[in-house]
Amino acid sequence: KRLKSGLTNLLSNKDITIFDGEASFINKNEISIKNRNKVIKISSNNIIISTGSKPFFPDNLKPNNKRIVDSDYVLNSKELPSSICILGGGYIGIEFAYLYNSFGVDVTIVESTNSILGFVDNEIVNELRKNYLKNGIKILESTKINEIDEKDDSISISFSNVNDQVDLNFDLLLLSTGRIPNTDNLELKNTKVKTDNFGFIKVDNKYLTNIDNIYAIGDVIGGSMLAHKASEEGSKVIEGIINPDIIKEDFIVPACIYCQP
C-alpha cells in the first residue's frame, strides 16, 4: 500500500491522470474503464498496453488457499508451515524455497524438467543446487505429481520419475508454475492486435503491435518479466512516439535470483 501510494503521488505531481478500474478496448483508439457501477470512456491517438502478468496454473491444479496456495497467498500469510512442497523450480520457486528454508521450514522443490532454473548457466545452477542440498532443501527433478490427497491437517502428494515413485505429506503445496499475460479481459479482438498461443502480445523492435497506434511493454510481451525491463521499454516507446525516426538500440537486462548464494 505504501509503494502504491508513493507511485500514485509521484504520477499525480507530474499531472498524469489516473483512472482506477478494469479497462478494455472498444476500438483501436478508445477504451472503456469500469469501476463498480461507473463506466468511463477515453480515447487517445496512441495506447500503450502494460497490464503485466498473473500466475499460471495447470488445468487440473488450482489454488484453494487451504492446502494448495499461490505466491500471493504465502506473501500475505501470517503463519509458517512446518513443511512445504514447491511445484516449479524457476525464479519464483527457487526464491520461496530459500525464504522458507531460512525460517526453518522443511522444503521440497519439485521440477518436471531435468533441471531447476533450466534457463540459467549450468555452472550457476550446479553451485546453487549443491548449496540448497547442503542446507536441507530437497530437490526432485524430472519429477511429476501423479495424485494429490488433500486432508484437513495436511496434503499427501504422490510423485514419480523415471526411477521411482514416492508419497510424501506436507502442510502446504505452493504452485509456482510460471506466469501468463494479463490479456484475456482486454477485448483485444476489438482492435485485431495479434497475440501468440499463450496470449503474449506480439510487437516489433519498437514495441509496436500490428496495429499502428497500439504499443505493448513489460510482462505482457513475454521475455524477462522484470520491472526495470518494463520501465526501460516504456521509455523507449515514448521516445519513439515523440521521434518516429529514432533507431532502437538493444539493451542488456540485468537480472538476479533473490536467494543465497
Protein language model regions, located:
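FAD-site-proximal beta/loop scaffold in flavoenzymes
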Residues: 64-80, 168-241, 247
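Feature captures the FAD/FMN-dependent oxidoreductase FAD-binding
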Residues: 1-46, 126, 139, 146-156, ...
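Rossmann-like dinucleotide-binding cores of NAD(P)H-dependent redox enzymes
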Residues: 2-4, 8, 75-76, 81-85, ...
